[in-house]
Amino acid sequence: MKKILTLSIILLAVSCAQKPVQQPLDNSVVYEMNVRQYTPEGTFAAAEKQLPRLKDLGVDIVWLMPIYPIGVEGRKGSLGSYYAIKDYCDINPEFGTLADFDSFLAEAHRLGLRVVIDWVANHTSPDAKWVTDAPLYWYERDAEGNLTFTADWSDTANLNYNNPDMCTEMVKSMRFWMERGIDGFRCDMACEVPLEFWERAISELRADYPGMYMLAEGEEPLLHSQCDFDASYSWELHHMMNAIARGEKNIPELLEYLAKDAERQPADAYRLMFTSNHDENSWAGTEFERMGDAAKVMAVLTFTLPGGQPLIYTGQEMGWNHRFAFFEKDPIPAWENNDYTDFYKWLIKTRHDNPALASGDKGGKFEVVSADDSTLVFTRTLPDNKVTVKAELKAPWSYEIVAE
């Protein structure tokens, strides 16, 4: 019996030693993966082989752009938009199979990475499974009974959130993926969906999955205080940084924005900060097109400003200066490490090593040391950790981070 007990303890110790440690959410760095463009193959199987590289880079949360089958009716380009979804509970065959996704997910978890998937709740494709299988009133319709769409999204059909059956099925579809083992969702155009739906969905899912991470594309404070999202987009900050890089905004305006955002957002809100993402890259240009030589110092701000949770988009970690085609195959031909890889590794390690840089109210107090026409110096301070950041926000753009 003593030998059996000893063996059990040894096996338990080995199991615990092998269990990957995930970074706390408040100190995590998000990586947005564009599966179609991530490898020449554009598949989960090929992307899975690259996960150790992401682990080495240091990121913590892998956000997958929509992984579902894409509608054919009204399709844009030859492959279509990821955001025109035909079936919420299946995989785009372009990327592989559900088994391939499960393998990708298992490998990510083995490496200690969280995986969240893009959730497009506002609309489906006009030939979606629900259009053909569900009652007519699951969708918004015009006076003639035709499906409706927003803006120029003619490859989509707006859902009807006044219908409780549709809402119930939407939560059920989200649960399908949580049961499969994902760690949460990035919710597209979150404010285009009634906040009451998010409040219900998050409450019901968190009852069974308390660690679920929720990221909203939107800036409405109620996304946090009412709906209980963890993180929300800092779109206004992003556009402010673009404008500073062009010489159209200045340091006082940046500080005014930060004070306003801190006042209106809940203290524990994570504010997603970025110099690029899939929308900006494809439609507004790369960070180098928009920010020029200021791109690196702006990235430093996304890792160090108060409340922030930093995001890295596909290719940024090697300085990939290319607008990805949105509706076609346009992959990175090969991955290589360079000075941008070293830069982002340094930024991520600096964040992980300094609790004062954590998101929400877990991070250190923000204080401006000095600010003039070109230079901003600020500190983030906890009782046992202090980080000083110096950012030159005019040419020659530069940065310095000192931790103590």
Residue ranges and their predicted role:
Residues 59, 182-183, 229, 307:
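A structural motif
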Residues 19-45, 51-60, 66-180, 200-209, ...:
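Substrate-binding/active-site clefts of carbohydrate-active enzymes
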Residues 4-13:
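Sec-dependent N-terminal signal peptides
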Residues 16-63, 69, 102, 107, ...:
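Carbohydrate-interacting/catalytic domains
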Residues 29-33, 62-64, 115-117, 185, ...:
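Hydrophobic faces of well-ordered beta-strands that scaffold small-molecule active sites
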Residues 35, 66, 117-123, 189-191, ...:
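A cross-domain feature marking catalytic cores of carbohydrate-active enzymes
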Residues 70-75, 123-128, 193-196, 222-225, ...:
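Short catalytic/ligand-binding loop motif for oxyanion handling, primarily in non-cytosolic enzymes
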Residues 105, 172, 188-274, 292, ...:
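Active-site-proximal helices and loops of the catalytic beta/alpha 8
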